[in-house]
Amino acid sequence: MHSNPLRKNLKPHLWFQLYWVVYLIWFFWLDLTVKNPTYIIHAPLDDLIPFCEWFVFPYCSWFFLLAGVTALLWWYDTASYDKLCLMMFSGMTFCLILYMVLPNGLDIRPTAEAIGRDNIAMRIMQMLWNADASVNVCPSIHCQSSGCMALAFSRSKLAQDRPGLKVLAWGWALLICASTVFTKQHSIVDVVCGLALVAVWVPVLYRKPKKGM
């Protein structure tokens, strides 16, 4: 009896995606229970970054980056897919634990009335603000996961000898990170902390072997 190659690919790696069930329940529980954060995240640089509602589109493109990179690595480079899941899911878990121990939030979001503009981007921003409270922000999971996806993809077989794809992956991820501060979804502090959680994995998973070994 011949084994089905698709079924073989499904086991066990796709089961890692069950983590999203745990993550979403945990995240939204925190979103509902943390009403008055103990720590307000703010940096002087935040006041110099203007609000631009049009960055909501690269902000929302995170979902496409997530789906695309996850599917491509799962199908074509299982080893890189495993590294992505390890980096991204462990980082998300760390963030959620930190949100519980050190409840934090933002005070930099403007109101629609203060902005005084009415366009499709502003309407999307208002829906986003209504759905996503300005709590549980540091480190930024949006930035942490974007960095993990760019790192895993750029070091995968798919991007090997394809510098254009590496630039595209990192450019997209950094645009998403920039969008978080231009839409006032995050402080620059959240972004730096989120990317720091990506950087710690580089020497662990992508350290070059020493010569002669």
Annotated model-derived regions:
Residues 31-44, 74-164:
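Membrane-interface loops
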Residues 56-72, 89, 93, 145:
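Hydrophobic alpha-helical transmembrane segments
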